From Swiss-Prot:
The gene is dcd. GO terms for molecular function: dCTP deaminase activity; nucleotide binding. It comes from the Bacteria. This is dCTP deaminase. DCTP binds at K111, S112, T113, Y114, A115, R116, T135, L136, E137, Q156, Y170, Q180. Catalyzes the deamination of dCTP to dUTP. It catalyses: dCTP + H2O + H(+) = dUTP + NH4(+). Its EC number is 3.5.4.13. Keywords: Hydrolase, Nucleotide metabolism, Nucleotide-binding. The active site is at E137 (proton donor/acceptor). CDD domains: trimeric_dUTPase. Signal peptide: none annotated. The lineage of its organism: Bacteria, Pseudomonadati, Pseudomonadota, Gammaproteobacteria, Pseudomonadales.
């Protein structure tokens, strides 16, 4: 497997719709204001967080069960900023919609700007032939409220191309998150 460069990412986005909408350069500021960077980087793509959030509150004192998750444990927020309570988490989604090629595995890593503030971004790998908006999980590991900015960079996608095509892709096996749009809760 080899990591793919900015040239490859740009070509795949423009010719094959791998990332939509696609920002072909790294943006660090807009209209004289600084933003957390997003867009193409040397060997990755920095994704943005959309303005849709589900903030975990557990007002119902439910047990967190991935097989039977209580959607009522979330408060829906639509805003340019999301405040995550101390020691809690929020779900969001990327602005970008992804279409991963059959011979590519995509790994997501959180941006250091957030990590240095105690905010951890978690995303599982984007498997070969998966497509959709990426559901992002933000963990606030601090004892203070934490702020997430919509429409700014939150994580970096790294694209790993295999020498050999997989036998069965995510699409082939009918993965449960195939084609997801919006913030998607756990499914079993």
């Amino acid at each position: 497997m080899s990591i793919k460069s900015d040239k490859w990412i740009r070509r795949m986005a423009q010719e094959h719709g791998m990332i939509e909408p696609f920002v072909e350069r790294q943006v660090r500021g807009e209209h004289d204001s600084r933003v957390i960077s997003f867009g193409v980087s040397s060997y990755g793509y920095d994704v943005r967080c959309a303005d849709e959030f589900k903030v975990f509150t557990n007002i119902n004192s439910a047990t967190v069960d991935p097989k039977n998750f209580d959607a009522g444990s979330f408060v829906d927020v639509k805003s340019d900023v999301c405040i995550i309570p101390p020691n809690s988490f929020a779900l969001a989604r990327t602005v970008e919609y992804f279409r991963i090629p059959r011979n590519v595995l995509t790994i997501c890593l959180g941006k250091s700007t957030y990590a240095r503030c105690g905010i951890i971004v978690n995303v599982t790998p984007l498997e070969p032939e998966w497509e959709g908006h990426v559901t992002l999980e933000f963990s606030n590991t601090t004892t203070l409220p934490a702020k997430i900015y919509a429409n700014e960079g939150v994580a970096q996608m790294l694209f790993l191309e295999s020498d050999e095509e997989c036998e069965v892709s995510y699409k082939d096996r009918g993965g449960k998150y195939q084609g997801q749009r919006g913030v998607t809760l756990p499914r079993t």
